[in-house]
Amino acid sequence: ALCGCVVASIGSSCGITYLMGGDYVNVCHSVKNMIANLTGMICDGAKPSCSLKISSGVSTAILSATLSMEGKHVTAAEGIIDEDVDKSIRNLTSIGKEAMCNTDDMVLNIMTHKCN
């Protein structure tokens, strides 16, 4: 599965952008920056490593908000990002819902077959 902490940090980036004086367009750009940057980070069920992923999410939220406020954002020419922010979000959820099933199985297999 996609790391829930990282996905939740997209909302943090929106709030940070708003607090920096951003408007709707800035918030949309921040969301696109987040999706482009952190999509694919998996949940491995290892709670101590969650703090590392939270740190990645928070620092990327700040970076994405700052870039957005400077007028910089990932465009539809790159990766899974679409011109429409809602479509970009749907692309992210499709990856989480459909593409991560095999990843979940592999992570579980690795965790249950360790020799520690």
Locate each region found by the language model.
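Functionally critical mobile loop/hinge segments
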Residues: S9, G21-N116
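Alpha-helical transmembrane segments of multipass membrane proteins
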Residues: G15-I16
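Aromatic-lined, polymer-binding surfaces characteristic
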Residues: A1-S9
